[in-house]
A protein has these predicted regions:
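Extracytoplasmic gate region of multi-pass secondary transporters
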Residues: 45-60, 178, 232-299, 339-340, ...
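Interfacial helix-cap and linker-helix signal at transmembrane-aqueous boundaries
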Residues: 60-61, 65, 95-96, 176-189, ...
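C-terminal transmembrane helical hairpin of 12-TM major facilitator-type secondary transporters
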Residues: 263-265, 269, 275-288, 292-346, ...
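Intracellular juxtamembrane helix-capping segments at the cytosolic ends
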Residues: 60, 133, 140-155, 162-163, ...
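C-terminal ends and interior cores of transmembrane alpha-helices
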Residues: 110-123, 209, 306-320
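Conserved MFS/SLC helix-loop-helix module at the cytosolic interface between two early adjacent transmembrane helices
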Residues: 87-127, 292
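Intracellular terminal tails of multi-pass secondary transporters
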Residues: 1-42, 190-224, 349, 356-358, ...
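Hydrophobic core of transmembrane alpha-helices in multi-pass small-molecule transporters
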Residues: 38-40, 44, 112-116, 126-146, ...
Length: 454
């Protein structure tokens, strides 16, 4: 690739020096739908395989695949991939700047497939940590991180809807891979399951990466990793929301199949539980995106996060049969993935489009620890108490805590709107000092307690 080609291959995790992206000139469609579909398929063949680790985990725990490995080790091997994916965000940013977005994603597609082949050759638990943990996380990160912010370049009014469709690919991929992985393991064995996943994902990811384009051709010359955001209260609220969401989300992703085994379901039934959870996400994410564009992204994020917490506390704790657990997995899947749909649009709305790259880069690194620790914490609670109740309570309250962060963020955003309106009116001479004081003192409290599209 020539220097000129590198310059024309921008990365969504970088801030261009010239021609910064603006919301006004986004096409809100056109080739953006091709990009959205391509990103959805990439998500399906990266995040979908990652979600299928719940089936691998249930198999490992049931069969004792690796001598001396504990439940905590098995859980950590899978969740490590997510932590690695997020913590390499600065590296993915540098690669995309130097090589371009497309070559970076192609590298990720190859690395991810190699990691699955290596996992098929694993004979010790530390082999699994290096292959399906570290190496898979690197590959998935190089695929996901450069592509995530691209959707916001192509859409304005339909941004959350398009983002929901793209992220729904992870749900469909998780559904397909969970069912397929369970069937392949039962009929062909663990080794072939890994190798088939490697081949299929390589073909899909490479093809779709070649179709993905960014809109801004200016050379990106500085890293979008602005730590000054960490001193902004609104951004800290977003980080808090993300951390609590990840602590709950990956417990659901990785432990539902094992919970099915614990309550006495067979391996075929157990593999259907995470599959239906991902089906719920595939259905729910575009709907959440559409509703978010219509009624407010922060509003829907609060409602969906709180609803997920209540569903976990009300249904999962009482799910002791196949039918009830299947229903819970499908229903909670509709709302559990709201973070992935709305985090980018919320960052744009609260921090501005020019801070999206910085916000995402810092966010992914900050999410590494909670994403890695979530499933091991839940399984450690289970093995320590002999019951899933503690893990279920932990998961439910994490979602409720995330909803609290979003509610406070909503109050902050409304307050900012009121202040901006008062300042604008004061500048134009349309209000006096008493009206300004009244708006600041009373309007904020009243508006925070009533419905407003945010």
């Amino acid at each position: 690739m020539s220097d000129k080609d590198k310059d024309s291959a921008p990365c969504p995790d970088l801030e261009p020096q010239r021609n910064p992206p603006t919301s006004e000139n986004a096409p809100d469609g056109g080739y953006g739908w091709v990009v959205t579909t391509s990103v959805a398929i990439v998500n399906g063949h990266s995040w979908g395989i990652n979600a299928a680790y719940s089936v691998f985990l249930a198999h490992f725990l049931k069969e004792g695949t690796f001598a001396g490995a504990t439940a905590l080790m098995y859980a950590a091997a899978g969740s490590l991939s997510v932590g690695v994916m997020m913590i390499i965000s600065p590296i993915a940013t540098i690669m995309a700047r130097e090589l371009g977005t497309r070559p970076t994603m192609l590298t990720g597609a190859v690395v991810q497939s190699i990691s699955l082949v290596c996992a098929s050759l694993s004979t010790k638990i530390w082999h699994l940590f290096l292959s399906q943990g570290v190496l898979f996380g690197i590959g998935m990160g190089l695929l996901f991180l450069p592509s995530y912010g691209i959707i916001s370049q192509w859409f304005t009014k339909r941004r959350a809807l398009a983002n929901g469709i793209a992220i729904a690919g992870a749900g469909l991929g998780g559904l397909a891979y969970s069912l397929a992985t369970g069937a392949i393991i039962r009929n062909m064995g663990l080794d072939l399951a890994y190798r088939i996943l490697a081949i299929v994902s390589a073909v899909a990811n490479i093809t779709c990466t070649l179709l993905i384009k960014t809109r801004y051709g200016a050379q990106a010359t500085r890293l979008a990793f602005d730590t000054s955001l960490l001193f902004k209260p609104e951004y800290l609220l977003i980080l808090g929301y993300g951390a609590f969401s990840m602590l709950g989300y990956f417990v659901l992703i990785f432990t539902l199949a094992n919970y099915a085994n614990v309550i006495g379901l067979n391996s075929s039934q157990a593999s259907m539980i995470p599959a239906f959870f991902m089906l719920g996400q595939a259905i729910g994410r575009p709907i959440v995106g559409w509703l978010s564009d219509r009624f407010g992204r922060i509003n829907l994020t609060f409602i969906m996060s709180f609803t997920t917490g209540i569903l976990i506390l009300a249904l999962w704790i009482n799910a002791n049969s196949f039918g009830v657990l299947l229903t819970f997995a499908l229903v909670v899947g509709l709302s559990a993935g709201v973070f992935w749909v709305n985090i980018s649009p919320i960052l744009v709305e609260v921090m501005g489009l020019t801070n999206l790259a910085s916000g995402l880069s810092c966010l992914w690194v900050a999410m590494a620890a909670p994403s890695t620790l979530s499933a091991p914490i839940a399984l450690e609670i289970y093995t320590g108490t002999g019951s899933y109740l503690g893990a279920q309570l932990f998961t439910g309250f994490m979602y409720i805590a995330s909803a609290v962060c979003v509610f406070v963020l909503r109050m902050w955003q409304i307050n900012r709107r009121i202040r901006d309106k008062v300042d604008s009116s004061a500048i134009s001479g349309l209000t006096d000092n008493n009206e300004e004081e009244h708006g600041e003192r009373q309007g904020w409290t009243l508006k925070c307690l009533r419905w407003e599209t945010v």
